[in-house]
Regions:
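Surface-exposed interaction regions that form or flank ligand-binding interfaces
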Residues: 1-65, 73-77, 88-91, 98-281
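Cell-envelope/extracellular polymer assembly enzymes that use nucleotide-activated donors
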Residues: 68
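Conserved beta3 VAIK motif of the Hanks protein kinase fold
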Residues: 80
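A short beta-strand motif that forms part of the nucleic acid-binding face
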Residues: 83-86
Length: 281
């Protein structure tokens, strides 16, 4: 290694230290993500023939939204909002009153939560603006950890996965022809970024043109990729790619970055600040 290359590597290393990382993940958000993971695991176990897309990204001129889980089963579509709210839940005037008992102080704490039914209804409305196909969407709110639930409307909701999967199997509006599958195919699931530093994660949409790797005289595009793991060194990253067809690639990148769309805004994040990427496509 020449003296010029040595100082170049030193400079690159210090530049990498100051690169942008993904935002801090709150404990509440992390707790909710774990709940979604557990929910999807149970759904796949009880409905092995269903198709699932997580964290459907919706970006329209009228607003942005996200649907936690979209399930396709026997030509029926189910949009599911997952709420991992503990304690006692009471619907009141279009909102939810959440009361939790503090196990350390033995005191009750009250919090007003927005209606997940309204949240899901808005998301479905915007999704119909984004997707050109026409299909019936059955809406369901799933409460994962509540001790007691009091709801006085006719919206569909569940608090145990067994009743929910039974409902999906035996109920729900069926879409005409192949419309449900066509609609499902157009829905965009979020990509997932993860950083070991402070256990940070982000659901977003990676811009297609920022995730292309030239390897052995070919270009591996975002649409080809399933997952990416990144091993960090002082002046470069060892990027390990697993393609959808099972092929594995590895490439060293000095100071790479990706661009993502998150809630309608574009951000740049350095690969040196990421450890794992899961593509939702």
């Amino acid at each position: 290694m020449g003296i010029g290359e040595f100082f170049h590597k030193i400079g690159v290393g210090f530049t990498r230290l100051g690169e942008n990382s993904i935002p801090h993940t709150t404990q509440a958000k992390r707790y909710g993500n774990w709940g979604e993971d557990e929910f999807v695991y149970h759904i796949r176990t009880h409905l092995p023939n269903c198709q699932i897309k997580r964290n459907i990204v919706i970006q329209t001129l009228e607003g942005n939204a996200e649907i936690d889980c979209l399930i396709l089963y026997n030509n029926k579509l189910f949009a599911i909002e997952i709420k991992r709210w503990k304690g006692e839940l009471t619907e009141c005037d279009g909102q939810f009153v959440q009361r939790k008992l503090d196990r350390w102080t033995d005191e009750w704490h009250t919090k007003i939560q927005k209606s997940p039914f309204r949240q899901l209804s808005r998301a479905i409305y915007l999704l119909r603006k984004q997707v050109t196909e026409k299909a019936w969407i059955n809406s369901i709110v799933y409460f994962e950890d509540a001790d007691r639930i009091s709801i006085n409307n006719k919206n569909t909701w569940f608090d145990n996965v067994y009743s929910l999967t039974e409902y999906i199997q035996n109920n729900g509006q069926v879409s005409y022809g192949n419309n449900a599958q066509a609609f499902f195919n157009q829905c965009i699931p979020a990509d997932y970024l993860y950083s070991n530093s402070w256990d940070k994660s982000l659901h977003c949409v990676i811009c297609d043109d920022s995730l292309a790797f030239r390897i052995s005289n070919k270009v591996v595009h975002k649409s080809d990729i399933s997952t990416i793991s990144i091993e960090h060194h002082w002046s470069y990253d060892e990027v390990k790619i697993e393609a959808k067809n099972g092929t594995r690639y590895a490439v060293n990148i000095e100071n790479g970055s990706i661009y993502v769309i998150d809630n309608g805004y574009k951000y740049r994040y350095a690969l040196c600040k990421l450890d794992y990427i899961h593509l939702g496509n």
